[in-house]
Design a protein with these regions (language model features):
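Catalytic cores of DNA base-excision repair glycosylases
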Residues: 1-152
Length: 154
């Protein structure tokens, strides 16, 4: 793969979002992994972020999943659910969410909590039509309380 061009990679990933950009990043990443890291995925989060296309969230995912680092990757689901249920105080950025969750969730639970929040966001606390009636934690949910308070006053 280090010798592959973006044009060679593209047909394999054309069905995903932003395939041109991702093909370019994958080609650059493969070269860099071989040339600078001996073909090994680095365990250091800062080193991971040097790879083309790898930002903080992706580095944290790799760190948590592959290297069992006690970090909290924040994607759209983690961000939304954390704000809705009150794990954060309506944070404005993924970084604020990450830092707040890392402060209050026991560090050994962070990688698992990341998956819990993603799954909850994908299947229960969805972006457009959250399934509050099916939610096992609606009793403690800030959004649920606010929505019910609003509907009672209308």
């Amino acid at each position: 793969m280090p010798a592959a061009t973006p044009e060679q990679i593209y047909p394999y990933i054309k069905s995903i979002s932003y395939p041109n950009n991702k093909a370019k990043n994958l080609a650059g990443m493969a070269r860099m992994l071989c040339e600078e890291f001996g073909g090994e995925v680095p365990s250091d989060l800062k080193e991971l972020q040097r790879l083309p296309g790898v930002g903080r969230k992706t580095a944290n995912v790799v760190g948590a999943v592959i290297w069992q680092k006690e970090v909290m990757p924040v994607d759209t689901h983690v961000f939304r659910v954390s704000n809705r249920i009150g794990l954060t105080n309506r944070s404005k950025t993924p970084l604020q969410t990450e830092l707040t969750l890392e402060k209050y969730i026991p560090s050994h639970l962070l990688p698992t909590a990341h998956h819990w929040l993603i799954l909850h966001g994908r299947y229960v606390c969805t972006a457009r039509a959250p399934k509050c009636a099916e939610c096992g934690i609606s009793t403690w949910c800030r959004k649920y309380a606010e929505d019910n308070k609003r509907s009672k006053t209308e």
